[in-house]
Amino acid sequence: MILRSLFNKRFFLIVLCFFVFFPLFALEKQITFDEEKIPGPKELVIYVTANDWGPSVDKIVFNAGKMIDPQKVRTINFEIYREKRMLFNHDRRVDWLEDDLEVSEVYTSDAYGNKIDEASTYLTAYFKYLPESKYASPFTGTILNNVHDIYGYRIINSYLDLEIYSMAGMVNSLAAKFKTSELITSGYKMSYAYYNPPKKNKKRPLIIWLHGISEGGRNPYIALLGIKAVNLASDEIQNCFDEGASVLIPQSPTTWLETTLLDSNGMRIWEPENISGFINRYSGTVKSILSKIISVPLDTPNTVPMAKTSYYTESLMDLIEVFLEQNPNIDRDRIYIGGCSAGGYMTLNMLIEKPGFFAAGIPTCEVYVNTKLSDEEIKILSKVPLWFVQAETDSMAKPSTYVSPTYKRLEGFGAKNLHLTMYKGVFDQTGKYFAEKDDEEDPDMPYEYNGHCSWIYVLNNDPKENGKTIFEWLSEQRR
């Protein structure tokens, strides 16, 4: 989720390659999420599950446009492809990069995917995925996610003379609770998603959740589903608050890590400067391609030590203020902010830059380099109720570089409402997924996620101290 050195040239090359070599992917129309949706003739509806490890397409309900005898439905006869679709030559659709999906079952159903043993125009295809499967997500997963970065799906059965690819919609009951919008601020658009609980007489708090580096762009559903942030609207978390809680999920156009500081080439420096992360996996390929065209310089360490204030600080604050004006039932003394990875950095950044505004913070696997935090900034943070969450196995945001020394300094400044949940690792809690079956001593060892994914625990309301979960604790905090 994070970058190895700031190296803006590297980022420039990645973005350049993306736009030069990969034309704009787009569906025929912009897709939103519904609680339920019925496909019309020759249409399909995608059912997306918000897993701890990310979104997955678990089933597709499609309308054959004719009655289909269940005796003629054989799973082996169906071919289902996940496709990237792009606009080419003035809106002529071209299908590109097909993934052949493994179908576990196809059957006749009602319009909502419930199995029936009689002829129907509706059929349902089921899929099964292992955690973190690259074929599971409905999103194309580009570095900067565009509003249309959703896969198309194509269902083919030559025996039944079927070919269906027109998408009627996508279904996820939690995502359907959220509305999406955009705010033009500082000359560009900032997308966001938000949820308001059913209206009650009392004022309610606001939870602001900030995504990581992989969920930036202009598709707020990626910020919602990419790391299961939709769970903030679940009954389990909403019931921690007497009146429920409003939820605001802003989406950075690029990443919260962009700072106000410019390098010698006039490009914004990213914070932190010397960390490892997923972009390095792309940079080698990008350089090898472009080296045949232009001269690509080697990495050079960044010499600017204090690139730390996010370029999006004021834009995010503008969005928060506008949202508060539009929702006067929100209690301004109970505004909570949290986020993971780059969003954890941005959480601390906002608490420092806007002292006294927020009631509490929950920075998770945060990447604000401790050595960049001045004593004055630590003093500001020490006055804010904080609950840090991290895993010992986090190699991307090593506790020794980030949360551990910061936490100790906060203790030294007398922070009175300070908490840290440090997990041994990040393990599946659902009981559905297990490690490789090569451990004879513990064959039921749960699946272990990357140690950076400690947001899984937070968004499942798992961290607990003195009998209170993290969101129960949050509900008690006031400015």
Model-identified regions with their sequence ranges:
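Bacterial N-terminal signal peptides
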Residues: I14-P23
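Short beta-strand element of the alpha/beta-hydrolase
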Residues: K202-E215
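Short, proline-enriched alpha-helix->beta-strand connector loops that line the catalytic pocket
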Residues: E243, I380-L386
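Primarily recognizes the serine-hydrolase "nucleophile elbow" in alpha/beta-hydrolase
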Residues: L324-I380
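C-terminal catalytic histidine-bearing segment of alpha/beta-hydrolase fold enzymes
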Residues: W387-S395, T401-R479
